[in-house]
Amino acid sequence: MLYPQEFDVIVVGGGHAGTEAALAAARMGCDTLLLTHNIETLGQMSCNPSIGGIGKGHLVKEVDALGGAMAAATDESGIQFRILNSSKGPAVRATRAQADRILYKAAIRQRLENQPHLWLFQQAVDDLMVEGDRVVGAVTQVGIRFRARTVVLTAGTFLDGKIHVGLNNYPAGRAGDPPAVSLSARLKELKLPQGRLKTGTPPRIDGRSIDFSKLIEQPGDGVAAADGTPASSPMPVFSFLGSAAQHPRQMPCWITNTNQRTHDILRTGFDRSPMFTGVIEGVGPRYCPSIEDKINRFADKNSHQIFLEPEGLTTNEYYPNGISTSLPFDIQLAAVRTMLGMENAYILRPGYAIEYDYFDPRELKTSFESKAIGGLFFAGQINGTTGYEEAAAQGLYAGANAALQAQGNPPLSFGRDQAYLGVLVDDLITKGVTEPYRMFTSRAEFRLQLREDNADMRLTEIGRSVGLVDDVRWDAFNRKRDAVSRETERLKSTWVHPAILPAADSERLFGKALEHEYNLADLMRRPGISYDTVAEALTIARPGNYVSRETLNSQLGADLAAAVIEQLEIAIKYAGYIDKQNEDVQRAAHYEHLRLPDELDYAQVTALSFEVRQKLTKHRPETLGQASRISGVTPAALSLLLIHLKRGRFKGFTGNDKVAAGPISADAVNTDINDNPAHAATDAA
């Protein structure tokens, strides 16, 4: 039957990508339908019970800055919070949280059920409705046909999924859930380039069978250790609107290690390993290898650290992070019991590997819309990524762009200098994947600007402009932005000099007496000098006219005041580095945002090698920046392409343009670039 209601956006799949996609489209005012094979598993954490980490935490903060749900749900469900790389620079500091699976899923479900313009429907999708070269809806397993202007596919590991435990395997989307075999077959019929990837998960352990007295405790930040050692730092918060008061009871993680005996037992199972015997065809994640892969690749290491992570407050289940495996169950059990504290471990669920289909993200436009099928968007593991955070970011992005298309508006996009989400999208659509892609800070060229702490400053205004950000978040953002601006100006315009700050106080606070007059911002630039230090100096130098944390706390509240002070300290201390990176961004912008003509026939650019012409024709990059990141497209090839465009007299590519000159206005070029078909090459560049 044809369902009587037509939707603006249909989202297929209810994992981390699907839920963010559906919420984003609905927040933007589009009538949105979320189709899932099981409403009870919406927002389920299929693998590890954690959110965030290096690079990943940055994505979560960006999703939050754009109005997404992941950070807020983590604040409501997180049972341990830590700041990773806390001793390093602000660009690579990252928030990570252990989450209670049940609480996290409930937090996501609550948001989905109460979001205006969003409908939920429990049915697996078996087919897409395609008319000509455009998708117009989806068909469920019992033949219900839903029509929509756009469709977002977020199928995760379900497309023709197959679980492996030893040499035994069976069809599944994940443990306990059926695969999406019919939908996978339908996508292959549409001639969309695809491949196989694999990921895995470790066996789960009953905590009652673990001897924690033998293990090393790892408490979270902001929590006193079991021996009474006080917390050395405040408890982190994920959402810009969150607070530590939202966190449930906190729990520690525990550390054990594999040993030589563990490795010996694991090796005895290699002849029954689906990975080593060639049963698994898909490529696994490089940065989250199985334990058998680790001991095979790093044979010189006799031990690997294993983190025992609690699955929640109301369960005894533990997740042993570091021993993902697809070896036979008898090997899993024997190996686990060789580890300290795990001698009597009881396994609740076996570890397994799962193979699944993904579709080549190089066949997507910058908006994540398919180049082949109009209105069809892809997000999450179907694009070849791995990780909840990468999926959530893609889901929000694809959902927003599906909504914008349904509304008749231009797509949303982010540059590599604007967001980790921009880096993620650009990497996927220009480079593609040969293994599951995960985010790291090292993937971003401009990471000093792409910090966790300023994700809202970078993105919330953009999110507001397209309807992603509600009034509550917008008001909070403006309060923070105004406070940062106001306080920055006050620090720059408030001066102290030797006559009013005694030498003894100056030496105590700054290490030496002041030589001349300084404003507070200049003093804060010194190593080891904080906002509180200059505030104390001002209290002494100008009693009654002072800047202080207490003043900000009373004006803004403690959480917002702390965020404002963090922004002030980073912006002032790293101003020189940030300014230099801004110059790098401006230099790169000349090429990065310069759009290539849609009608450009690369086969006619005879100065280019056959390989380069072939790759440019295949991938059809939208900008010169994207073209530069395609494998095999060299700087020399770009120069030859520029010469061709100049000879063709495309707007912005005239004979007088100099490659090394200052940036040409990309906006001016892009206005008319596609209105000027190439002429015969008659003049010199």
Swiss-Prot record:
Cellular compartment(s): Cytoplasm
Lineage: Bacteria, Pseudomonadati, Pseudomonadota, Betaproteobacteria, Burkholderiales
Keyword match tRNA processing: yes
Cofactor(s) this protein requires: FAD
Binding site for FAD: 13-18
Record's function text: NAD-binding protein involved in the addition of a carboxymethylaminomethyl (cmnm) group at the wobble position (U34) of certain tRNAs, forming tRNA-cmnm(5)s(2)U34.
Single Gene Ontology BP annotation: tRNA wobble uridine modification
Keyword field contains Secreted: no
SMART domains referenced in this protein's UniProt entry, alphabetically: GIDA_assoc_3 (SM01228)
Family as reported in the entry's similarity comment: Belongs to the MnmG family.
Protein species of origin: Leptothrix cholodnii (strain ATCC 51168 / LMG 8142 / SP-6) (Leptothrix discophora (strain SP-6))
Positions contributing to NAD(+) binding: 284-298
GO molecular function: flavin adenine dinucleotide binding
Transmembrane segments: none
Designated gene of the protein: mnmG
Protein name listed in UniProt: tRNA uridine 5-carboxymethylaminomethyl modification enzyme MnmG
